[in-house]
Regions:
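Acyl/amide activation-and-transfer machinery of modular secondary-metabolite enzymes
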Residues: 1-12, 53-76
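Small/charged-rich amphipathic helices and low-complexity linkers that mediate inter-subunit docking
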Residues: 1-19, 23, 31-34
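Helical lid/core segments from catalytic subdomains that handle acyl or acyl-like groups
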Residues: 62-104
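Hydrophobic "lid/gating" helix adjacent to the active-site nucleophile
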Residues: 19-56
Length: 104
């Protein structure tokens, strides 16, 4: 499914707060998705597991035009989530590996 979403207010809010628009929207999407139990189901082996929360992830661009992956610990406080996500992106940016799950 594809839908058009008017993000004008969110964009302005991000500018007013001085935060990343993409991280603000990511937080809101994850908050909405986590409220739907079915979105928290995962298949592990031969059973279905329902998680209490979701682990948002994003790609992080590097100066050499490659990218890395970053996983962000969810926090219900939008500004706390954004601050931690920015720090995680900076930590992952110079990483030579495609995936670094050392935080887990």
């Amino acid at each position: 499914m594809t839908v058009n979403v008017d993000c004008t207010r969110a964009y302005q809010e991000a500018k007013d707060k001085g935060v990343s628009f993409s991280l603000l929207v990511l937080h809101r999407i994850v908050t909405a998705a986590a409220a739907v139990e079915e979105f928290r189901y995962r298949i592990e082996g031969d059973r279905v597991v329902c998680y209490d929360s979701l682990l948002p992830e994003a790609t992080v661009g590097r100066a050499d035009h490659t990218f890395s992956f970053a996983a962000f610990e969810y926090d219900p406080d939008e500004l706390v989530f954004i601050r931690r996500a920015k720090a995680e992106m900076e930590r992952c940016r110079p990483n030579a590996y495609w995936w670094d799950a050392s935080y887990r």
